[in-house]
C-alpha cells in the first residue's frame, strides 16, 4: 500500500492535471501552464512532443537539472515507462502532459514561453492517404512558432528520408523560422542541404537503434525562431 500511495504521489506531482474538452487527451481552452506552480520556479523551458518511452527527455533532464522539461505524450504505456525512468534516474525537473500536441500548443502554453521544442521520430504515416495525419505540417509549424520565444530552437529528427525532406520543406517555407545549419550536408542530389549534425543532447534511444539495425539513419534538422 505504501508503495502504491508513494507512486500515486509521484504521479500527482509529475503528471499535469489538464482540463479536458471531449476526450481524455484533449486540452480545454481554459488550460494554463504556470511554471512556478508546476515546477516551483521559472527556468529554461524544454518541451518534447511525442516523448515515447521517455529515453531522450529523461537523459537530457538529468544532464540539465537547472532547466524545466515538459514531456507531451498521448499513449499511457509510454507515460508509464517515462515515469519509471524518471524515478530510476531521480530527475525532479520533468513534468508530463498526456495530451494531443496541437491542442496543448494552442490552449495551454503561452505565447513566447518555450526556449526549446523537440519532435524526435514522429510517426511517419507511410501510406500517402495518411500523410495528412503527419505531425509536422505548415499549420503545426504555426503553433510551434507561437509558443517559441524569439531565438528559441526547434529540433527535429526522423529516420525516414522522405519525411525528413517534407519537414525541411515545411520549415524552409515558414516565415518565422531560419535554418541553424543552412547548406550543411548538401550533395549533388540534394543541393539545398541544411541538415543538422547529430545533436549531442539527443541520446541514442532503443527506437533509433532499431532503425539503424534496419539500415535507416537519422536525419536531424534545427531551426531558430526569428
Task: Indicate where each model-derived feature is located.
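Conserved SAM/SAH-binding beta-strand->alpha-helix loop
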Residues: 75
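Single conserved hydrophobic/aromatic residue that forms the stacking wall/gate
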Residues: 1-7, 11, 160
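A short glycine-rich, Lys/Arg-flanked "PGG" loop and its adjoining helix->strand segment in the class I
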Residues: 136-150
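S-adenosyl-L-methionine
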Residues: 83-111
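Conserved beta-strand signature within the Rossmann-like core of class I S-adenosyl-L-methionine
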Residues: 150-158
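Glycine-rich SAM-binding Motif I of class I
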Residues: 54-55
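Class I SAM-dependent methyltransferase core
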Residues: 48
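Class I S-adenosyl-L-methionine
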Residues: 169, 173-226
